[in-house]
Amino acid sequence: MDKCIKFDTMINHFNRYQVGLTLNNLYPTINGKCACGCNNDLPKNRKKWFSDICRQKSYINFAIVKGDNKIIRDEVFKRDKGFCCKCGVYSKYWQADHIRPVFIGGGACSLYNLQTLCIDCHKEKTKTRKN
């Protein structure tokens, strides 16, 4: 489950950058359980994360929520493997596209609203939206 859904009261989905949100706000440690939400009991030698994988995934998600463009682009490219989601062509030159436009609430918080589009498909989508 997307961690952002649990924290709707803290995250303004219309803002690209979540000012004032801290890692501890998004991932509190509760009752000796891993802060990432995996529900694993923390080993005695750990205070917040069950594993390094939990920590890394949480840091990446936090960077996405905070609007870190490099992390966002890296994760979208990794997920879509460099292929345009519309025409299927592979390119290292691509654009991250908001499926639901930012101005109607498709701004921040998760990768679910982003897709890779080749430059031609992105131009076509943008042109169609303006008409």
Regions found by a protein language model. Give the residues of each.
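BZIP DNA-binding basic region
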Residues: 1-16, 22-60
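Short, charged surface segments at domain edges that flank catalytic/cofactor-binding sites
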Residues: 14-30, 54-86, 106-108, 112
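Short cysteine-rich loop/turn motifs with clustered Cys
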Residues: 32-41, 68-95, 118-120
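Short Cys/His-rich "knuckle" micro-motifs
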Residues: 42-48, 93-97, 126-130
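Active-site donor-binding loop signature of nucleotide-sugar glycosyltransferases
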Residues: 52, 101, 119
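Short Cys/His-centered divalent metal-binding micro-motifs
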Residues: 55, 92-93, 114-131
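Histidine-centered nuclease catalytic patch
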Residues: 88-116
